[in-house]
Amino acid sequence: MHGLLLAAGLISLPLHVLAHPQPSSTSLAGRAVDLNEYRIGHRSSYTSNDEMMKQPSIASFRAGTYVEVATEMVKQTMPNMEFRLVDDHYIGQSGIGHVRFRQTMHGIDIDNSDFNVNIGQDGKVLSHGNSFYTGPAPESSPVQKRDFSDPMQALHGVRKALNLPIKAEGATVENMSEHKVMFKGTSGALSDPTAKLCYMAKEDGSLALTWRVETDIGDNWLLSYMDAKDTGKVHNVVDYVAHATFQVYKWGLADPTEGNREILTNPWNLQTSPLTWLADGQNNFTATRGNNAIAQYNPDGGNDYENNYRPSPKNLKFEYPYSANMDPPKTYIDASVTQLFYTSNVCHDLYYMLGFNEKAGNFQVNNRGQGGKGNDYVILNAQDGSGTNNANFATPPDGQPGRMRAYIWTRANPPRDASFEAGTIIHEYTHGLSNRLCGGPANSRCLNAIESGGMGEGWGDFYATAVRLKPKDTRKTNYVKGGWVNNSPKGVRMYPYSTDMSVNPLVYTSNNQLNEVHAIGTVWATMLYELLWNLIDKHGKNDGPVPIFKNGIPSDGKYLAMKIVMDGMAIQPCNPNFVQARDAILDADKNLTKASNKCEIWKAFAKRGLGVGAKFDPKNRIGSNEVPKECK
């Protein structure tokens, strides 16, 4: 019998390198460069299903396959526009076809101009999102005129502008494909930097030709859009890092204060991990490695992980001693790696059941012919030496491994290990979920605007909080985030998650005073906590570790909330705002349950100021407590 010995904890951190559980500025580690200055602005629109019904010629359009319907819809909606089909379309678990297009100009991508079309189960257009550029086009191709700088100048430009620890003296340029090169012979990055020629649509309505320089330096995995003529000018920056028997803290325990470790035998779900957690279809492993994840000790914080230490008991008994009083942390590294491996694999299995499968871009080496791109398990680094008091997750596009770094927290004596706070690990893994779903598996750049980035943090907190609910909890139950690992009863957020406005007063217009993604994420997660309890009060709460489905719909309110929030991620446009994400959740429920929860959803958002009349303006959001007349 195989078994796993694990421990689960609860903390919330970013995931793309997404990190920093407490409100702080988003900066390059140790380099005093504020990446918020270079965030991509909000340009997308979202046409909900209700709005689609007002356009009957499009709403009723059918032209063949779901991809053909979507393609023809874009042609009709955006005539004379040049675009290409992105190769990551799929039909999700809820029956919605997701098709995405990238706008091009003279054969060159406009990297932040996307059109996503959602096709309902009836073969008609359900909704769509659009951030296509509609301004003046360059008269001729810059490639024909060679109207751009050498890509090496762009690499030097980003090194200087962002103070990156990359040395490129003597480096050479190798062609990878049309408009894309790789820099060989550099040092300081974890992989060879690359540069791709592309356009960027600016908030002022102009179009900039840029070199998109990709540099992975560990705590930051950057896409820097450098002006193709003035290579010292940075237009935008995207960071992919947002910021057997197992003896573990069982799933549902937020941290070591909520229970004791148990020995679990074969804890995997064969429906979602048919190869188990310790095999990939080619090899059977006796260490913390398998199809979904590979976990190891990483004390130096480096990128090499294959040969790092990981527990490998000959009898597959991953049973190791741990207590919160043990010190130093390396004395319990076996328990730490095991717990991290366990929690991440359970995340994989639960999210798979809710719709984050191979076609949707999940993290697996072997996709077993089920769609998507493989060879992308999650690299899990326990007690990572590259930082403290944090955790982060890097989410490159489908087909490239995700990377989670769990750090030691020094705010208690002895220090505490993030691997044992399940909330932190669930939060980080959820960054991988949201970045793969929003924008599609091939595009991990769709949660980079300040409000969409905030929702990325909020989703992490929401799923971590939903998982930790206890049988006796009610809507009066409050939860803090990251309390144990931070050694603070207040946790790492501004307020506890609560449906009591006197405990947590956050509303939509609170965002007008906030400019940091974790703070904005707390507002979003607060709204989702209201939604969670509205649905639990209506449908009840399944306290088991997996959902029970009836006709493809979770039968209880907790898992139903997790399901429609996840479906909404895939429906919404690239870089959505709160209003668009709310509408996407409403459309997800309409598709899944025929809008049977419409009023519960509206009342949750309206209570926190995101009602019918709410309007997005990055400088002056307008709140509303109104619900549709049929919900009054």
Swiss-Prot record:
Propeptide residue interval(s) = 20-246
Q: Which residues are glycosylated?
A: N284, N591
Q: Which domain of life is it from?
A: Eukaryota
Q: Print the keywords alphabetically.
A: Glycoprotein, Hydrolase, Metal-binding, Metalloprotease, Protease, Secreted, Signal, Virulence, Zinc, Zymogen
Question: What cofactor does this chain's UniProt record say it requires?
Answer: Zn(2+)
Q: Name one GO cellular component term.
A: extracellular region
Tell me where it resides. Answer: Secreted
Checking Pfam families in the record gives: FTP (PF07504), Peptidase_M36 (PF02128)
Q: What Gene Ontology terms describe what this protein does at the molecular function level?
A: metalloendopeptidase activity; zinc ion binding
Record comment: activity regulation: PMSF, soybean trypsin inhibitor (SBTI) and chymostatin strongly inhibit the proteinase.
Q: PROSITE patterns recorded for this chain?
A: ZINC_PROTEASE
GO biological process terms, alphabetically, are:
proteolysis
Signal sequence bounds: 1-19
The annotated active site, in chain numbering, is H431
> For this UniProt entry, what is the primary localization, expressed as one broad class?
secreted
Which residues does the annotation say bind Zn(2+)?
Answer: T430, S434
Tell me yes or no: is Zinc among this UniProt entry's keywords: yes
EC code(s) of this entry: 3.4.24.-
Q: Which Gene3D superfamilies match?
A: 3.10.170.10, Neutral Protease Domain 2 (1.10.390.10)
The record describes how the cofactor is bound as: Binds 1 zinc ion per subunit.
What pH-dependence text does the entry carry?
Optimum pH is 9.
Keyword Protease applies? yes
**Family to which this protein belongs:** Belongs to the peptidase M36 family.
Role according to the record: Secreted metalloproteinase probably acting as a virulence factor.
Known PANTHER family for this protein?
A: EXTRACELLULAR METALLOPROTEINASE MEP
Its recorded name reads Extracellular metalloproteinase 1
| Organism for this UniProt entry | Arthroderma otae (Microsporum canis)
